[in-house]
């Protein structure tokens, strides 16, 4: 059985980042609500307590009885997790004079403590807290300080229990990964045997046992998640998998043909459906973004349902749901707050059982599995693309002419990113067709044509994103190419908004 680290989530914005850092150590972990610790699980090797937006003094602060965990498993408390353990053992936690947020340095630490093995002197750590541990119980030992925080880390004497006031999971903590490695590998004894190859081997075996000779249908989007799910299922059940790829008319230029060719080269049984007439008719005159999304979502369900019913004896619906979707579908108390299904409503409407072979993976792990499966790199590294496609990059109503303009402009931009070696440096990129026209001059004639905005962002998880600082020379060439080659466009702008406050997509 796969050994694991359990991360108890107290509501921190960086809880998923803890999970990703542990997985990067080739160690399997699971994130569970703070009050849902899985008892009697022999595969658990250690426990990490996350941070929290609460103070330990808040009436609604998340609290849990750790008596059944402490002494049985090694524990690492991060920020609120460290404060909570100190506070519940008669230590003192007090509001800081000012909230400490940002870089700090460990001015002193116990070099002989296993948690700090290999950590450099004066190493930078990331702080984000309003409360500070000001006193610890007699059996707690201070093991690190910063210039502003006296008790930056502690260990319970004689126990494998640590607390750190800083966030080792955050990129800005320079030796954060080393600290987590020390806990996960040296303290908990994890074997670091979680790999794409081991995941594929175990998942294929599980899928064969789960699905048997049943038939499965899967909706493909052209994105990495559904594509990797399809290849994995194909390895497990072969001809019993049927994939459906619906073209709603708002894909990127030549995308339907190119993606279908990719899928056929991968040996997948794929049904391609051109439903563009239906979608354009239903979207005619619609300008409100959310209504556009709902029309496309419902239309996809209708088309998919019709095609799936043409396949006899289908028992399962497969989806490319990944681990962050599953985590986000639960509130901190474990109650459902939104469906994580990639295609909302399909399982209920079609009365099919649900199969989600990637539900344990983060996005970067999905790509690693795709490479292990031998999938082409251009498919694995594709940027995220919204389900409604270019419909949410056309501000205002949707027409075939607007889609044509946007497809041509987007094709020039994306190909340019590839040609300049910039594509893999950005998280997501695309062109937005603006609902305005501007005056221009071409030759000796005055023009009054459309404006487009280029968008490119850098990110690690899409929760936050910064605008990509692309070279001016590149932007100038792309602007010139679009204006000269795309009929109907005479102005190109570049969006330099970050998330937050803006979102990655405009609609």
From Swiss-Prot:
Keyword Hydrolase: no
The Glutamine amidotransferase type-1 domain, residue ranges: 4-193
Alphabetized InterPro entries for the sequence: Class_I_gatase-like, GATASE, GMP_synth_C, GMP_synth_GATase, GMP_synthase, GMPS_ATP_PPase_dom, NAD/GMP_synthase, Rossmann-like_a/b/a_fold
Superkingdom of source: Bacteria
One example of a Gene Ontology biological process annotation: GMP biosynthetic process
Domain GMPS ATP-PPase: 194-382
UniProt GO MF annotations: ATP binding; GMP synthase activity
Keyword flag Hydrolase: no
Pathway: Purine metabolism; GMP biosynthesis; GMP from XMP (L-Gln route): step 1/1
UniProt binding sites for ATP: 221-227
EC category name: ligase
Enzymatic reactions: XMP + L-glutamine + ATP + H2O = GMP + L-glutamate + AMP + diphosphate + 2 H(+)
Keywords: ATP-binding, Glutamine amidotransferase, GMP biosynthesis, Ligase, Nucleotide-binding, Purine biosynthesis
Pfam families attached to this UniProt entry: GATase, GMP_synt_C, NAD_synthase
Active site: 79, 167, 169
Enzyme Commission identifier(s): 6.3.5.2
GO cellular component: cytosol
HAMAP family per the UniProt record, alphabetical: GMP_synthase
Complex formation: Homodimer.
Function: Catalyzes the synthesis of GMP from XMP.
NCBIfam families: guaA_Cterm (TIGR00884), guaA_Nterm (TIGR00888), PRK00074.1 (NF000848)
Protein name per the record: GMP synthase [glutamine-hydrolyzing] 1
Species lineage: Bacteria, Pseudomonadati, Bacteroidota, Bacteroidia, Bacteroidales
């Amino acid at each position: 059985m796969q050994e694991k680290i359990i991360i108890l989530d107290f509501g921190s914005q960086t809880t998923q980042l803890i999970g990703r850092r542990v997985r990067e150590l080739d160690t399997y972990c699971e994130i569970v609500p703070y009050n849902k610790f899985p008892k009697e699980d022999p595969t658990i090797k250690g426990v990490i307590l996350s941070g929290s937006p609460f103070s330990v003094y808040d009436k609604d602060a998340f609290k849990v009885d750790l008596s059944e965990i402490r002494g049985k498993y090694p524990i690492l408390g991060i920020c609120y997790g460290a404060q909570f353990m100190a506070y519940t053992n008669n230590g003192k936690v007090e509001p800081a004079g000012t909230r400490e947020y940002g870089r700090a340095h460990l001015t002193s630490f116990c070099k002989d403590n296993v948690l700090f093995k290999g950590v450099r002197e004066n190493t930078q750590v990331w702080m984000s807290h309003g409360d500070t541990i000001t006193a610890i119980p007699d059996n707690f030992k201070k093991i690190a300080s910063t210039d502003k925080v006296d008790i930056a880390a502690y260990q319970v004497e004689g126990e494998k229990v640590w607390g750190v006031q800083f966030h080792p999971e955050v990129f800005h903590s320079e030796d954060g990964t080393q600290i987590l490695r020390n806990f996960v590998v040296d303290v908990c004894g994890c074997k670091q045997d979680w790999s794409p190859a081991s995941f594929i081997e175990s998942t294929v075996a599980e899928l064969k046992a789960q699905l048997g000779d049943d038939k499965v249908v899967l909706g493909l989007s052209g994105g990495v998640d559904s594509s990797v799910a399809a290849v994995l299922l194909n390895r497990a059940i072969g001809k019993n998998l049927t994939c459906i790829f619906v073209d709603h008319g708002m894909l990127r230029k030549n995308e339907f043909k190119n993606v279908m060719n990719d899928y056929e080269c991968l040996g997948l049984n794929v049904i391609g459906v051109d439903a563009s007439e239906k979608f354009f008719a239903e979207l005619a005159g619609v300008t409100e973004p959310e209504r556009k999304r709902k029309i496309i979502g419902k239309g996809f369900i209708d088309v998919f349902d019709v095609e799936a019913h043409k396949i006899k004896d289908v028992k399962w619906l497969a989806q490319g749901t990944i681990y962050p979707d599953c985590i986000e579908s639960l509130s901190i108390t474990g109650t459902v707050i939104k469906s994580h299904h990639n295609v909302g409503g399909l399982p209920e409407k079609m009365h099919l059982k649900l199969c989600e072979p990637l539900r344990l993976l983060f996005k970067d792990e999905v790509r690693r599995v795709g490479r292990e499966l031998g999938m082409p790199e251009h498919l694995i590294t594709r940027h995220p693309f919204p389900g409604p496609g270019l419909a949410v990059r056309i501000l205002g109503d949707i027409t075939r002419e607007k889609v044509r303009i946007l497809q041509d402009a987007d094709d020039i931009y994306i190909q340019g990113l590839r040609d300049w070696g910039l594509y893999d440096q950005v998280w997501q990129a695309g062109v937005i067709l603006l609902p305005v026209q501007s005056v221009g001059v071409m030759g000796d004639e005055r023009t009054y044509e459309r404006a487009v905005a280029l968008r490119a962002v850098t990110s690690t998880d899409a929760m936050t994103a910064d605008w990509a600082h692309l070279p001016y020379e590149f932007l100038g060439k792309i602007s010139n190419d679009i204006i000269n080659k795309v009929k109907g466009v005479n102005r190109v702008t570049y969006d330099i908004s970050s998330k937050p406050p803006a979102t990655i997509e405009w609609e």
